[in-house]
UniProtKB/Swiss-Prot annotation:
InterPro entries: FeS_biogenesis, FeS_cluster_insertion, FeS_cluster_insertion_CS, FeS_cluster_insertion_RrpA, HesB-like_dom_sf. One of its GO terms (biological process) is iron-sulfur cluster assembly. Binds 1 iron-sulfur cluster per subunit. SUPFAM superfamilies: HesB-like domain. Iron-sulfur cluster binds at C46, C116, C118. Required for insertion of 4Fe-4S clusters for at least IspG. Belongs to the HesB/IscA family. Its cofactor is iron-sulfur cluster. GO terms for molecular function: 2 iron, 2 sulfur cluster binding; 4 iron, 4 sulfur cluster binding; iron ion binding. Homodimer. This is Iron-sulfur cluster insertion protein ErpA. The keyword Metal-binding applies. Pfam families: Fe-S_biosyn.
Length: 130
């Protein structure tokens, strides 16, 4: 199992403090401190691949664990990414934004060659690009 601590800038995936704060808030609402945010890539969507977000208590052997400290400076949350999904997410940014269209988690993925209008589906072009 690979473990990466983003707070020390050792990962090529950026997990923002804003996203960590929102994850911590949602975990508190669920009243289960064992929850972690899992980001995954699956086949589907209008562009070929789609992002998935879920809470998971289980950490698998092939998961990369990214730990991000929250803005309070005291708590932190874990982001889990399986090995297949990780290859499509290198150099990506996982953020949480608030705007006129509402609040949402977003992934800014430089590996995505095309994206759909909703931002949850993408294609990568040639696998040689990874």
């Amino acid at each position: 199992m690979a473990s990466v601590d983003v707070s020390q800038n050792t990962s090529d995936i950026h997990f923002s403090v804003s996203a960590a704060d929102k994850v911590a808030e949602l975990i508190k609402e669920e009243d289960n401190s064992n929850l972690n945010l899992r980001v995954s890539i699956t086949g589907g969507g209008c562009s070929g691949f789609q992002y998935g977000f879920s809470f998971d208590e289980q950490i698998n052997d092939d998961d990369t664990i990214i730990i991000q400290q929250c803005s309070d400076g005291k708590s932190s949350v874990k982001l889990l990414i399986d090995s297949m999904s990780y290859q499509y997410l290198h150099d990506a940014e996982i953020d949480y934004i608030k705007g006129i269209q509402g609040e949402q988690f977003v992934i800014r993925n430089p590996n995505a060659k095309t994206t759909c209008g909703c931002g949850s589906s993408f294609s990568i072009g040639d696998e040689d690009d990874l």
